[in-house]
């Protein structure tokens, strides 16, 4: 759908580790629509990519506010029609970021042309990290398809 609409997309992923970028680039012809994928696993690199540190400090890195910052900043950085931001905790305690609920992931898709955020939360299971990443990635792709239709 992105290809036929001549839209572009970029991602800033944390807990999915580039899985959404991988899913998009598995589609033949995706080079015409996929501009950039960043895996910003640490706060430092989220901030270097433009995420406002005050947002992280006020709401935590594991928040919809941070996911929104990620999706908008990656769209702005790459001048993409859509930006995807994903942050959250999967099956673990993060000693560097003590706030936020375990097994809760925040997904934001920013539509640059409409200046609009589409948001979703996924509650993961106690299954493996790989299994939970697949659930999140599938949710993002389904969400994106719903926006584009």
Locate predicted features.
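Short alpha-helical segments enriched in small residues
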Residues: 1-149
């Amino acid at each position: 759908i992105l290809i036929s609409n001549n839209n572009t997309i970029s991602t800033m992923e944390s807990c999915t580790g580039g899985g959404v970028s991988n899913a998009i680039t598995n589609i033949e012809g995706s080079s015409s629509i996929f501009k950039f994928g960043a895996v910003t696993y640490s706060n430092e690199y989220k901030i270097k990519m433009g995420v406002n540190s005050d947002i992280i400090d006020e709401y935590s890195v594991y928040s919809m506010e941070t996911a929104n910052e990620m999706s908008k900043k990656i769209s702005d950085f790459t001048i993409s029609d859509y930006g995807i931001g994903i942050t959250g905790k999967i099956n673990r305690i993060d000693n560097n970021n003590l706030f936020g609920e375990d097994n809760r992931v925040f997904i934001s898709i920013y539509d640059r042309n409409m200046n609009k955020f589409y948001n979703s939360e996924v509650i993961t299971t106690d299954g493996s990290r790989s299994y939970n990443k697949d659930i999140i990635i599938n949710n993002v792709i389904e969400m994106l398809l719903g926006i584009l239709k």
